């Protein structure tokens, strides 16, 4: 199942959804552009698209409503932005549309300022350039080399890279990492490296 949204204006679009990268049930994340009419947009030639994060999740382990709750909790939906950076949820079917609208109404009741988030039908999702994908993970060359993974399709589709991108960015707990570790099939050296990175709490800025 897919969950697609725009969360925050960040120079590196990969940062906005790191909390979801290591959230329960999330299989894969990609950053890119959507919602506009310009064919084949790029970061430097975006046209009328919005920077977007696509999240693929396992519906047996989490659900759309849980992801929406995280979305509202972790950004300021009242901030007015240009279309490139606007807050938006892109729905893929009528059920997602209904849930997104209901969650927006619920979120609005808890604050006085008007929410600016747009609920839009999903259109073509264009992947952002490789250097945007799993951005924080790519700032750890030793780890990338140890994982034997290169920027490109393999990195973009990797479950392990998705999870580690969140953990290495400081958006997961050490307890959750330890619980998940058997399913990640990491070497002891890689696991120790991730632990140290999480404990250091150093987040990379663009």
Name these PLM-found stretches.
Residues 1-206:
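Flexible coil/turn and secondary-structure edge motifs
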């Amino acid at each position: 199942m897919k969950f697609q949204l725009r969360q925050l204006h960040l120079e590196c679009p990969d940062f906005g959804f790191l909390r979801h990268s290591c959230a329960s049930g999330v299989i894969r994340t990609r950053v890119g552009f959507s919602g506009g009419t310009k064919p084949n947009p790029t970061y430097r030639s975006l046209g009328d698209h919005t920077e977007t994060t696509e999240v693929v999740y396992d519906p047996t382990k989490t659900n759309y409503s849980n992801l929406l709750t995280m979305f509202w909790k972790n950004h300021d939906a009242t901030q007015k932005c240009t279309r490139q950076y606007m807050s938006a949820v892109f729905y893929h079917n009528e059920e997602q549309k209904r849930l997104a609208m209901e969650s927006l109404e619920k979120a609005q009741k808890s604050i006085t300022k008007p929410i600016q988030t747009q609920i839009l039908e999903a259109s073509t999702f264009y992947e952002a350039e490789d250097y945007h994908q799993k951005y924080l993970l790519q700032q750890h060359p030793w780890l990338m080399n140890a994982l034997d993974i290169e920027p490109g399709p393999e990195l973009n589709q990797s479950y392990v890279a998705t999870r580690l991108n969140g953990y290495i960015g400081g958006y997961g707990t050490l307890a959750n990492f330890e619980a998940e570790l058997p399913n990640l099939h990491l070497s002891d050296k890689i696991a120790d490296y991730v632990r140290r990175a999480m404990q250091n709490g150093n987040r990379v800025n663009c």
